[in-house]
Amino acid sequence: MDEKLSRVDPKLLDLLVCPLSKGRLSYDREHNELVSEKARLAYPIRDGIPIMLVSEARRLDE
């Protein structure tokens, strides 16, 4: 499966929160990541599975 073509079920986004800030997440289709604006982190999605580990998250540039 091409990671660039994966999608996130909107129902899943309603359930998931950032493990650090407990805030809502949004899906970044271009980078295939779940983004926490509050924590300024982007969590990768690999093989259709969100990796919700702070240690795996990418910091968003200011």
From Swiss-Prot:
> Origin, by domain of life?
Bacteria
Q: Show the InterPro entries listed in the entry.
A: Trm112-like
Record's Gene Ontology CC terms? cytosol
The signal sequence is none
UniProt similarity note: Belongs to the UPF0434 family.
PANTHER family named among the record's database cross-references: PROTEIN PREY, MITOCHONDRIAL, ZGC:162634
Per its record, how is this protein called by name? Answer: UPF0434 protein Rleg2_3773
Q: Which organism is it from?
A: Rhizobium leguminosarum bv. trifolii (strain WSM2304)
